[in-house]
Swiss-Prot record:
<comment type="similarity">
    <text>Belongs to the ATPase delta chain family.</text>
</comment>
<protein>
    <recommendedName>
        <fullName>ATP synthase subunit delta</fullName>
    </recommendedName>
</protein>
<comment type="subunit">
    <text>F-type ATPases have 2 components, F(1) - the catalytic core - and F(0) - the membrane proton channel. F(1) has five subunits: alpha(3), beta(3), gamma(1), delta(1), epsilon(1). CF(0) has four main subunits: a(1), b(1), b'(1) and c(10-14). The alpha and beta chains form an alternating ring which encloses part of the gamma chain. F(1) is attached to F(0) by a central stalk formed by the gamma and epsilon chains, while a peripheral stalk is formed by the delta, b and b' chains.</text>
</comment>
<dbReference type="Pfam" id="PF00213">
    <property type="entry name" value="OSCP"/>
</dbReference>
<keyword id="KW-0406">Ion transport</keyword>
<comment type="function">
    <text>This protein is part of the stalk that links CF(0) to CF(1). It either transmits conformational changes from CF(0) to CF(1) or is implicated in proton conduction.</text>
</comment>
<keyword id="KW-0375">Hydrogen ion transport</keyword>
<dbReference type="GO" id="GO:0046933">
    <property type="term" value="F:proton-transporting ATP synthase activity, rotational mechanism"/>
</dbReference>
<keyword id="KW-0139">CF(1)</keyword>
<dbReference type="InterPro" id="IPR000711">
    <property type="entry name" value="ATPase_OSCP/dsu"/>
</dbReference>
<dbReference type="InterPro" id="IPR026015">
    <property type="entry name" value="ATP_synth_OSCP/delta_N_sf"/>
</dbReference>
<keyword id="KW-0066">ATP synthesis</keyword>
<dbReference type="InterPro" id="IPR020781">
    <property type="entry name" value="ATPase_OSCP/d_CS"/>
</dbReference>
<dbReference type="GO" id="GO:0005886">
    <property type="term" value="C:plasma membrane"/>
</dbReference>
<keyword id="KW-0997">Cell inner membrane</keyword>
<dbReference type="GO" id="GO:0045259">
    <property type="term" value="C:proton-transporting ATP synthase complex"/>
</dbReference>
<comment type="function">
    <text>F(1)F(0) ATP synthase produces ATP from ADP in the presence of a proton or sodium gradient. F-type ATPases consist of two structural domains, F(1) containing the extramembraneous catalytic core and F(0) containing the membrane proton channel, linked together by a central stalk and a peripheral stalk. During catalysis, ATP synthesis in the catalytic domain of F(1) is coupled via a rotary mechanism of the central stalk subunits to proton translocation.</text>
</comment>
Length: 186
């Protein structure tokens, strides 16, 4: 599995590759992708879940039980539950987010899709998101999925990353450049 441009570590990439191949063999790629996206969302929203994932103080079995309880509540597939259990027993939960990113990146690559990571100063309307997706699709010549995050510290505008390319049209960056230019004048 190529990890170039995905920011996925070697450890996470190996686990992601193993899960991808297993899901492919079981013809469960779509279900596994949905389950992993849900897990990623849960980890982003729950500080308690992030503590379980990152805590070196919890035993392997405690981490595995906690993760299994969470996954059972949201009704994810047995494949993902077994995978997360294995990751917990191997003390690798700290890399779970990278494993999820690696799996989803490989699935997108196999489907001829690219993921644009967009950070905007404020939430985009559905119309704005559709226009951005369409513009990126035309510029890149392939299907594009947009991973949108909001960061008010940008002040205005957005930062778009696709693979190793980045377009930064944020007000924060423009102000920083102006500040540096003004320092050079005086």
């Amino acid at each position: 599995m190529a990890t170039e441009g995905t920011g996925v570590s070697g450890l996470a990439a190996r686990y992601a590759t193993a899960l991808f191949e297993l899901a492919d063999e079981n013809k469960a790629l779509d279900q596994t992708a949905q389950d992993l996206a849900l897990l990623k969302q849960l980890m982003a929203e729950s500080a308690d879940l992030r503590r379980v994932v990152r805590s070196p103080l919890l035993s392997r079995s405690d981490q595995a039980r906690a993760m299994d309880a969470v996954l059972a509540q949201v009704d994810v597939s047995g494949l993902v539950r077994q995978f997360v259990g294995l990751v917990a027993r191997n003390r690798r939960l700290f890399a779970l987010s990278g494993m999820i990113d690696g799996f989803l990146a490989e699935l997108a690559r196999r489907r001829g899709e690219q993921t644009a990571r967009v950070v905007a100063a404020r939430p985009l309307s559905q119309e704005q998101l559709d226009a951005l997706t369409d513009a990126l699709r035309r510029a890149l010549g392939s299907k594009v999925s947009v991973d949108l995050r909001v960061d008010p510290s940008l002040i205005g505008g957005m930062v778009v990353k696709v693979g190793s390319r980045m377009i930064d049209s944020s007000v924060r960056t423009k102000l920083t450049k102006l500040k540096l230019a003004m320092k050079g004048v005086g």
